[in-house]
Amino acid sequence: MRLCLLGFIACLLTPALVLAESTPRLTPAQLRELERQARILYEQTQEFLRQQEKSGKKVRKARRVEPKPTSCNLPSPKRAAQFSQELLPGIPLADRYALYVGACGLGDVVKLTQQLVRFQTVNGEEPPAKNPAVVAMGRFLQQWAKTRGFGFRVAGRKDVFELSWGEGPPFLGLVFHGDVAPVAAEEWKYKPFEPTVVNGRLYGRGVMDDKGPLATALISLSMAQEMGLAPQRGKVLVIIGNDEESSWLGMQEYARTEQLPTHIISVDSGYPVVVAQSGVVALNLEAMLGTVDSAGAAMLLPVDASAGESLNQIPAAASLSLAPFAGKSIDQGLAAAKAAVEATRKERSGLKAEVKVVSAPGSGSRIVISTQGKAAQASSPEEGRNALWDLAAIADKLPLADNGLTAMLQMVTRRFDGDHQGERLGFTEKDPFMGSMTAALTLLRVKNGKATLAINMRRPRSSEGNEDFHQALDHAIALINQESDGRVVEGPGRFVSDPHVTDLKSPLVATLIDIYQRHRSIRGELEPISIRGNTYARLFPRGVDFGPGIQELGPYTGHKADEFISLDHLGLNTQMLAEAIHTLALSSNAP
């Protein structure tokens, strides 16, 4: 029986067959089969040696070398050298690069993801360029790029980070965002900005959306460079926006003013490849709290309310502050509030609500009703539980004074509660490929005597143009205004974007589908998909999304409490993106 004398990696690839220099690229399945056969052969060899020794026969040990496991802890040049042509004769460079990423990439990706997650890049009212966490992350990325010989610059509105590799015009752009969704800390078991690995999962805000994917790209490029690969058709860019969870102004500026790559891949959605995104609609409703002329049967006056943390996220928490009204005592109001909560609990399964009395300096005591829901992206409202719906349902059972905030909550119950698709507003848009419309309430605030409610909608393509859609919005607003006796009106900030649809049959799409299909061992034909989500890819004419979500490996957890990605999932994402980068930019046969 032949003994393996070539070291561990060579042992896995060469004992079962002799590979010629002309060997074509191996598929992931072929690589796995070679590894399986080699492991069996190695185990048989060891058993043969043990039996020989037991029988007392002499075993010739001259020049016998024990296989050594790959060491991923070596300095980069020595680590990459384990996958050299000398140690793996006959294996094409593309496959040796894939083996290198498969063996050592995951550890590097986890480490870099953890470093990125520690920057608490939640955007507030200040622009990203003035957010200390965003600025600090930019400095970190600049140093990371410098030590590896990559270019780095700041673009957009001084809030887009661009890492570059190679010469010539940009050919491949990998697009990510470095800002993350807000965190409701009380909902988390693990600390959101102290990433940790537990039971094969990496936890932390941004590990799925979108710092984990960013790390897969950076490590894939770094390891390609270590293997002696280089861009063949032009520059490879890693483009990192930092306002994806808010305004998009920085990346819009970048897409409008910069020379754009031939191929654009965002990694902020799912597989096999996303070629279409619903249009985004932002709408604001307002109501002045005003004064109340007569009390009637009212016992409580709404004075403040709050729901949500982000314009594109379903509220996980909501609260309503009430003052005793028309001579009623705090105890009477408290009893009424508790009764309303209990009555609502009987009607709404899983309701999480509490009532408490708090002290309001200068204003006496206040009764506060709080509800807890489940956060989800506004593009997938059905995956969450809107805490504002629950709060409005409770308010509907309270003897409230009739002011603007009361009117706003009544409107929520009448036109939104239980309806994710905007049907109660009169919308019926559906598309066979892109699906149905959605309408989600995301942010409620009271400031300077005025209640403001943000609505986030997603619309599929249709035969009707933007003008027709604006008319439908006008009709919905008129209905709301009429039902509230003129108290709820549209505020400033209406925004309507077109759906984004790129070429479903482009070489880029075909390449990415082929990569996904081979790595997932999927038989049959795969088709590109559409999402209601909203990624930076829509800003680029040929932009598509490739990952990171794989439903079979776990739910998409971006924007949710205890956001996580399994290590198996993260490793697979890294291997697929690495192959995409090689095929599209590092090979002379790039499409």
Question: Which role does the model predict for each range below?
Answer:
Residues 1-4:
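Positively charged n-region of N-terminal signal peptides that target proteins for export
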Residues 210-292, 331, 335-338, 419-438:
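Acidic/histidine-rich catalytic neighborhood of metal-dependent amide-processing enzymes
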Residues 18-20:
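Boundary at the C-terminal end of the N-terminal hydrophobic targeting segment
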Residues 285, 295-297, 316-318, 325, ...:
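A short core secondary-structure module
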Residues 25-184, 452-455, 466, 569:
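N-terminal helical capping/dimerization or prosegment-like subdomains
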Residues 368, 372-454, 458-475, 480-591:
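An extended, acidic, His-containing surface patch that forms the Zn2+-binding/catalytic region
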Residues 171-240, 246, 258-259, 560-561, ...:
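Active-site metal-coordination/substrate-binding segment of hydrolases
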